[in-house]
């Protein structure tokens, strides 16, 4: 009862208080809440398969998945966060704007343009019900993703940032190598385009020179 003694809080506080309520009766929830209360102390995110177990009450599982996914985003573990967040819908949780915001942050960080823009549009469509800071940051992420075009310097730079983040987390497997291969392919395409443009400009300039010989 003490947890709920205050007036109805904002949705982010509501999520935290709901999680604390689950923790009073479920030791697994208590462990998760304790984990999410501090920074990570390992490069590998703890697996929480029980959150995806259909035998767990959906109301508890969905909201704790949001709590855990939000924490994973804060820890820059974006792929891991989407394991828990991607399939959730706003109607599944007590903090719908928080869900859409952190889905958007993860997709933005991973440069998944279409998925990112889709969830950010949904968040901004209900901006009047969302925390102002969510709406403000969502507009910035939307503008950034709108400007991402395949094989441009912006796109290449964003993916290189993602590679550095993954390496900082100790990730060096097939996923990272695949992103690295994609960056190299994009660089090759960009260089080829620039070379073609230079050749066209040189050819156009050369074609306009008239010989002075009789």
What are these regions (language model features)?
Residues 1-214:
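Mature extracytoplasmic or organellar-lumen-exposed domains after removal of signal/transit peptides
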């Amino acid at each position: 009862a003490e947890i709920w003694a205050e007036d109805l809080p904002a949705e982010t506080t509501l999520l935290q208080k709901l999680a604390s309520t689950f923790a009073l009766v479920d030791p697994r929830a208590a462990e998760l809440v304790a984990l999410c209360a501090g920074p990570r102390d390992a490069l590998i995110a703890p697996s929480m398969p029980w959150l995806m177990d259909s035998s767990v009450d959906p109301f508890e599982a969905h909201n704790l998945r949001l709590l855990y996914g939000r924490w994973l985003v804060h820890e820059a573990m974006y792929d891991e966060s989407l394991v828990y967040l991607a399939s959730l819908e706003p109607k599944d949780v007590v903090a719908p704007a928080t869900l859409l915001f952190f889905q958007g942050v993860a997709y933005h960080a991973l440069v998944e343009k279409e998925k990112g823009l889709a969830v950010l549009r949904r968040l901004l469509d209900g901006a009047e019900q969302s925390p102002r800071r969510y709406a403000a940051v969502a507009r910035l992420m939307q503008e950034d993703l709108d400007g991402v075009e395949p094989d441009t310097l912006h796109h290449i730079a964003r993916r290189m940032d993602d590679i550095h983040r993954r390496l900082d987390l100790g990730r060096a497997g097939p996923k990272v190598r695949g992103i690295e291969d994609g960056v190299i392919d994009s660089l090759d395409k960009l260089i080829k385009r620039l070379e073609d443009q230079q050749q066209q400009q040189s050819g156009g300039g050369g074609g306009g020179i008239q010989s002075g010989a009789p």
